[in-house]
Structures are given as C-alpha cells and as structure tokens.
A protein has these predicted regions:
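Active-site Tyr-X3-Lys motif and surrounding loop/helix of classical short-chain dehydrogenase/reductase
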Residues: 64-68
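Bacterial N-terminal signal peptides that target proteins for export
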Residues: 2-11
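Boundary at the C-terminal end of the N-terminal hydrophobic targeting segment
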Residues: 22-26
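Bacterial N-terminal signal peptides
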Residues: 12-20
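Flexible coil segments in periplasmic/lumen-exposed cytochrome c-class electron-transfer proteins
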Residues: 29-52, 117-177
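His/Cys-centered metal/cofactor-coordination and adjacent catalytic loops
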Residues: 27-62, 75, 79-94
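The canonical Cys-X-X-Cys-His
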Residues: 70-80, 103, 107, 122, ...
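Gly/Gly-Pro-rich "capping" loops immediately C-terminal to redox-active cysteine motifs
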Residues: 63, 79-109, 124-128
C-alpha cells in the first residue's frame, strides 16, 4: 500500500473514533475470517481489522505490529498479552464483546467508570499517534488473542513487512523521510 492509502486508513480510523454515541450501540465482533488485505493489515467481511495466521503459525504483518505496539503502549496497564491487571480489564475478554468502532471510541475517548466498588480511569489516546496510527493493528492483535487464535508471548514467525509500510507509518507519525 502506498503512503496515501495508509494515511487515509489512519484518518478514517480517527474519524470513526469521534462517532462515539453511535459506536456505543454497535454489535459485537463477528466472524474473524480475513477477506481482504491492505498494506499488511487484514479485514473481515464487515471491514473490521482481523488476523490471518497460517497453518505453520506465521502471523500476518498487521497483527505482529499490533503485538509490538500493544507491548510498548498498553501492557503497563492491561498486562501481558492483554490478560488484564489488578486495575485494568482483561482485553482478551473485552474484545469478545467490543466491535471495532466501540474499541476506537474507548481508546480515543478514554473511559471513566467510578462507583462505590471501583474507580477505573483510562486516559484518552486520541492525540497519541503511536496509538492512533496503529489502532487497527492493535485491535487485530487483541482480536487474535481474544479468539484464542494467537497464544501468549511474541509470535514466533511473522509475514514480512509490506512495501510502503514504513513510509506510510512515518507519514502518519509525522516523521520526515
């Protein structure tokens, strides 16, 4: 995929994040079967990012990038492999109910759930390009974990990075080439 394509995906993803009210009522994720690949990221029939793991265990590039980004940004609160912590939920369980649009709304808008039993707060990541430029990849990784298609730990094998991925990533992040 060329730089424009990746940038369009990132902008569309950010735009979806602000559709918050409608996103709250979206259906849970459906069949994760991959049907289309764009720039290393696979999508299901509904257009949500998904994983493509081959019989020999090779993980698609987007899911592998999602693993790397998750571990650099989300792990501190949500624990290794999305398994949760004493103060942040298990995302492998949450993604069994969260659609892609709900996931984006939660990540971009943050979450605040305060009651007599708990005080949970997740900040907004809407302006964090290290998150929003790779939100589809992070979702794909967590989706693979939530369905049991991908085990714990670093994937042993990954597909090669697709042509133009680095350039598109740098552009989204605002890094000159």
């Amino acid at each position: 995929m060329d730089v424009k394509g990746h940038s369009r995906i990132a902008l569309a993803t950010i735009a979806l994040a602000f559709a918050g009210a409608a996103a709250a009522f979206a259906a849970a994720p459906g069949n994760p079967k991959p049907v289309k690949e764009v720039g290393g990221l696979w999508f299901d029939k509904d257009g949500a990012p998904t994983y493509n793991i081959t019989k020999d265990g090779t993980v698609d590039w987007g899911t592998f990038v999602g693993y790397l980004r998750y571990n650099s940004i989300c792990l501190d609160c949500h624990g290794p492999d999305g398994s949760g912590s004493s103060y942040a939920p298990d995302l492998t369980q949450a993604l069994q109910q969260l659609s892609y649009s709900q996931f984006i709304a939660d990540v971009a808008g943050g979450i605040k759930s305060v009651n007599t039993a708990q005080d949970l707060v997740m900040p907004s990541f809407a302006t964090n390009k290290n998150v929003m430029c790779f939100i589809g990849e992070i979702y794909s990784y967590l989706r693979a974990r939530s369905t049991g298609a991908l085990g714990r730990g670093r994937p042993a094998k990954s597909a090669p990075d697709p042509k133009g991925f680095d350039e598109a990533s740098y552009k989204c992040l605002g890094i000159p080439m």
